[in-house]
Amino acid sequence: NDNIRSMGVALTPCIIPEVGKPGFSIPDGKIEIGMGIHGEPGIMLSDRMPADELVDMLMGKLLNDMPLADGDRVSVMINGLGATSLEELYIVYRAVQKQLSGIGVSIVMPHVGEYSTSMEMAGMSISIFKLDEELEGLLADEAITPFYTNVNK
């Protein structure tokens, strides 16, 4: 979709249930930027960094690919990959919210939690969903599925 951009980061590999061990490795002190939840290779390895710096890097890539302007409305999803605490995810959300509000972008219906995970993988993804009136209405509609529920009407 032209209105959604996502990028994730992995701090540790996922465990493959059938074999009981990681299917890949990430060197100590490194993170993999852009890694997929199934272990698909990312775009680069980087040294570990504070959350605010990591968010700056990820948001820079997202906003470079999908520029936003003063007055835009977005929904944000901070998705934990399976072994990242909710507290850590909210630290990421705080940094995303600060950055977006700084350019005049409003966040509607933020989602922070584990929505799509991998076994024991530490990391998270940031998804930005640019809304128009129709999309915002659809996002607010009731939804009950195994992986996503919205009954906040």
Where are these regions (language model features)?
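Mixed-charge interfacial surface used for oligomerization/domain docking
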Residues: N1-I91
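C-terminal non-catalytic interaction/assembly regions of soluble proteins
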Residues: K61-K153
